[in-house]
């Protein structure tokens, strides 16, 4: 299994694309996913979550996740990447917690979330305060409607998972096998 660390720290960025299989990866950005056509599978930690058209999901910073696409359908997804430091009121929670289930089914997605995603996807330039307000609205709905759990419970006892997670969190430090806690004793 190839794991990838992505450095996404550009404030707020959006991609509207046809999803493909994406290998396990993690990054410091909050990843918002909204299926506009078809279906995809979102893997978070060791769990796989099915998403249909109209479903919304969020992956918190530094959580290993991946995507799978099955079937021959036309699938389109909006991906938003939100830099967590833009949201100081949520920053601590974003580091500690993760949604128990990252997917909200279409019937439960609040219309404000859909409008905010579409607004953020459609702009190329705009007032940074408006951009931040729309992104903040998404996070407000996430934290008020999605049950949270400790982020450490999302992971796995898998050696590769733990190694990638450790490197991602400590890449600015001098890293050696002796310093990695899961290789000791």
What does each model-identified segment do?
Residues 146, 169-170, 174-185:
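Basic/polar phosphate-binding segments, predominantly the helix-turn-helix DNA-binding elements
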Residues 7-98, 127-128:
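N-terminal regulatory/effector-sensing and dimerization cores
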Residues 90, 97, 106-107, 178-180:
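Surface-exposed loop/turn and secondary-structure junction residues enriched for glycine/proline
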Residues 24-27, 152, 156, 169, ...:
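Residue-level marker of regulatory loop/turn positions in helix-turn-helix DNA-binding domains and
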Residues 1-3:
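Absolute protein N-terminus
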């Amino acid at each position: 299994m190839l794991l990838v660390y992505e450095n996404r720290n550009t404030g707020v960025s959006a991609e509207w694309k046809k999803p493909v299989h994406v290998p396990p990866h993690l990054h410091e950005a909050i990843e918002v996913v909204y299926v506009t056509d078809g279906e995809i599978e979102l893997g978070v930690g060791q769990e796989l979550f099915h998403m249909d058209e109209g479903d919304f999901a969020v992956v918190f910073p530094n959580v290993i996740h991946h995507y799978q696409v099955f079937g021959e359908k036309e699938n389109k997804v909006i991906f938003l990447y939100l830099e967590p430091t833009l949201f100081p009121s949520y920053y601590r929670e974003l580091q500690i917690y993760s949604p128990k289930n990252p997917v909200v089914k279409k019937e439960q997605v609040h219309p404000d979330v859909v409008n905010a995603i579409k607004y953020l996807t459609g702009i190329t330039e705009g007032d940074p305060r408006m951009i931040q307000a729309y992104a903040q609205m998404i996070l407000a709905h996430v934290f008020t409607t999605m049950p949270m759990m400790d982020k450490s419970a999302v992971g796995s006892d898998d050696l590769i998972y733990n190694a990638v997670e450790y490197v991602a969190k400590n890449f600015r430090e001098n890293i050696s096998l002796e310093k990695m806690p899961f290789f000791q004793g």
